[in-house]
């Protein structure tokens, strides 16, 4: 041992404790190496998202206003009930393939940021190019202003208030402002509210599906009801099917849009308890739940509403369903408020996650 080393040892106190692992971790300065992204991080406020909150964060992002509007357009394009249902299953399969990639990256890189982290890790040069693209997309294209407008429109329609452009935008701005304040100042309260809205949304879709099954099994038989049930037989399922590739691809795009949001949890993994284990179970459970509910609601639509009316309904198939089951007055009130709740829940979870993506981009520099 050299004399300088001996002098350094002599200056150390005899009763000093050895440095702990925590002290060692705090003494390590963060580097700009991309390999550091494989290390898990914990958010400043801790890991506040339980399994249930994580599940709602995903399923509430997936189930939006699409299930109330797109089934009619898909049946009109495909021509038959069976082919339409097949496309809903096919959309779930395609989303599952995409989900596998998200699970692989999420378990390997359990940090908030989602695609920003994954693209930075995969495409390292030019530096910050991938993260800048993700930031631009998140800021300019990723927000959910359209759902805010939908919320304002359907609240006014459901409450039977004469709509105007000012009142619609005022409600939209009020919703967005309230959600921003809640998520910014009251983290746990915001999570609780979006959990409640998410469960209300799931319960509403389940209620619609079970209502359709109840009508099929216990409602008084009429000629219109018999015609609706006939199209659910094996021969009726595939009648007038349109197998054109152009038609199927367009309809499949519409179906795939209804499954958007499967990787929503990947954006907030810093705040999830047991992130890897939670991600492995929440993502597949959300995919199976969405596929099951979509099929159930579609069957309810086809069992209650005549096929010709379904094809001509455009984006109003849910309105026809509620009108057939509950009557015009009740359906006209319940349906718009249901869509408004769906839109509000979607805005809450999108706001919650997009803020994390933006902050991940800012604090990575």
Predicted region positions:
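Selective recognition of specific alpha-helical transmembrane segments in multi-pass small-molecule
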Residues: 93-97, 201-213, 280-307
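Membrane-interface alpha-helices at helix entry/exit sites of multi-pass transporters
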Residues: 125-135, 165-168, 275-286, 333, ...
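Hydrophobic transmembrane alpha-helices that form the core helical bundles
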Residues: 96-184, 343-357
């Amino acid at each position: 041992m050299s004399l300088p080393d001996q002098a350094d040892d002599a200056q150390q106190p005899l009763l000093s404790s050895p440095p702990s692992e925590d002290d060692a971790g705090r003494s390590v300065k963060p580097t700009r190496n991309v390999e550091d992204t494989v290390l898990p991080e914990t958010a400043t406020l801790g890991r506040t998202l339980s399994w249930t909150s994580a599940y709602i964060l995903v399923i509430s992002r997936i189930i939006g206003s699409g299930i109330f509007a797109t089934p009619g357009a898909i049946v009109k394009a495909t021509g038959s009930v069976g082919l339409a249902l097949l496309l809903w299953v096919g959309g779930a399969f395609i989303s599952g393939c995409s989900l596998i990639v998200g699970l692989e990256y999420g378990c390997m890189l359990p940090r908030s940021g989602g695609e920003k982290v994954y693209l930075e890790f995969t495409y390292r040069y030019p530096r910050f190019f991938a993260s800048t693209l993700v930031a631009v997309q998140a800021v300019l294209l990723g927000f959910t202003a359209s759902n805010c407008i939908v919320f304002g429109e359907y609240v006014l329609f459901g409450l039977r208030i004469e709509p105007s452009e000012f009142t619609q935008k005022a409600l939209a701005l009020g919703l967005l402002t309230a959600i921003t304040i809640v998520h910014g100042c009251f983290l746990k309260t915001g999570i609780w509210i979006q959990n409640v809205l998410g469960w209300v949304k799931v319960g509403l879709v389940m209620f619609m599906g079970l209502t359709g099954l109840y009508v099929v099994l216990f409602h008084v038989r009429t000629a219109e009801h018999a015609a609706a049930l006939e199209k659910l037989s094996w021969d009726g399922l595939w009648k007038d099917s349109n197998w054109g590739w152009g038609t199927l691809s367009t309809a499949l795009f519409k179906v795939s849009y209804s499954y958007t949001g499967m990787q929503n949890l990947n954006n907030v993994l810093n705040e999830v308890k047991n992130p890897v284990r939670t991600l492995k179970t929440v993502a597949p459970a959300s995919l199976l739940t969405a596929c099951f509910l979509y099929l159930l609601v579609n069957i309810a639509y086809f069992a209650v509403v005549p096929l010709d009316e379904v094809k001509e309904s455009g984006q109003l198939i849910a309105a026809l369903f509620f009108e057939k089951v509950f009557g015009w007055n009740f359906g006209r009130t319940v349906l718009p408020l249901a869509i408004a709740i769906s839109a509000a829940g979607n805005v809450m979870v999108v706001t919650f996650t997009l803020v994390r993506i933006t902050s991940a981009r800012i604090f990575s520099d």
